[in-house]
């Protein structure tokens, strides 16, 4: 179930997914044995949701691990709510709020994700709150925190980092403090709601050379991603590292661009 959520949540990353941490244990509803001609018999819970085996575009190279990291198990209550909803033991609407920058503001990703989650699990409310050019500090305003809290989310997803890393004077300490301010404000208003952080997809830098505008891969994205992962580890957030999954420092931007999914 965790794998399906990651797959539908991030349609831009079309690789088979696996989770770094175990799905939380819960009472078995029942078991069914599935046989396969080429694989040994294995046991499946009857509430298991199949994950479609979707591949990246053929041009994508040097892909990293596509996994969701949750070493503290903060998402366990969320997975359990999804399980109960899918099994028909709950009719409560599960509410997800996704805040971030332009790739959330574009709405295609979150709205498609919300539709697929609803088709699979039932009563899912998926609200996107993206702002073009947003930094994480864009949301460190009492009114925006109140707007998020008023939706009574079961999960909040944070997708920032692109605009922070575009600053040529990018400072890791400042970025860390800004994330800390946002997370502290969210936790003050939503103390029992898990937070999932995603890293940026990669970006290009622009500069002038011989009176012509030239583009190159932004080298600060990798530094920002490292800062975000360190912050999440230090502060108990779950992380999905999209940047690493699509190729990281060496291939992320090139993979997107060659597949005509990104341009400088």
Model-derived regions: residue spans:
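Flexible, glycine- and charge-enriched loops at secondary-structure boundaries
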Residues: 68, 168-176, 214-221
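Proline-centered loop/turn at the N-terminus of a beta-strand
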Residues: 193-196, 238
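Catalytic His-Asp segment of secreted/periplasmic serine-dependent ester chemistry enzymes
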Residues: 202-264
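Alpha/beta-hydrolase-fold catalytic nucleophile elbow
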Residues: 159, 198-199
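N-terminal secretory targeting modules
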Residues: 4-10, 16-99, 103-123, 147-152
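Conserved SGNH/GDSL esterase-like catalytic core that processes O-acyl groups on lipids
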Residues: 93-193, 204
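Alpha-helical scaffolding within the catalytic cores
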Residues: 70-84, 137-150, 177-185, 222-226, ...
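Extracytoplasmic/secreted cell-surface and envelope-processing proteins
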Residues: 24-26, 106-108, 165-170, 204-209, ...
């Amino acid at each position: 179930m965790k794998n399906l959520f990651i797959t539908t949540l991030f349609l831009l990353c079309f690789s088979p997914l696996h989770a770094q941490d175990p799905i939380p244990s819960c009472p078995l509803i029942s078991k069914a044995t599935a046989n396969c001609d080429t694989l040994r018999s294995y046991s499946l819970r009857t509430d298991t949701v199949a994950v479609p085996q979707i591949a990246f575009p053929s041009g994508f190279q040097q892909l990293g691990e596509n996994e969701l990291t949750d070493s503290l198990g903060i998402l366990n209550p969320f997975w359990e709510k999804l399980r109960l909803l899918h099994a028909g033991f709950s009719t409560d609407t599960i509410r997800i709020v996704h805040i971030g920058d332009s790739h959330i503001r574009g709405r295609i990703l979150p709205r498609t994700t919300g539709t697929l989650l609803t088709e699979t699990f039932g009563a899912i409310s998926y609200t996107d709150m993206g702002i073009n050019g947003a930094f994480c500090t864009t949301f460190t305003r009492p009114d925006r925190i109140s707007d998020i809290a008023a939706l009574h989310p079961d999960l909040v997803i944070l997708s920032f980092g692109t605009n922070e890393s575009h600053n040529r004077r990018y400072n890791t300490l400042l970025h860390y403090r800004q994330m800390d301010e946002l997370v502290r404000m969210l936790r003050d208003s939503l103390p029992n709601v898990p937070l999932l952080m995603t890293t940026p997809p990669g970006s290009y830098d622009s500069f002038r050379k011989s009176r012509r505008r030239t583009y190159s891969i932004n080298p600060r994205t990798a530094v920002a991603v490292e800062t975000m992962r360190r912050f999440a580890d230090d502060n108990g957030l779950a992380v999905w590292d999209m940047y690493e999954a699509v190729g990281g420092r060496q291939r992320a931007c090139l993979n997107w661009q060659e597949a005509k999914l990104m341009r400088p």
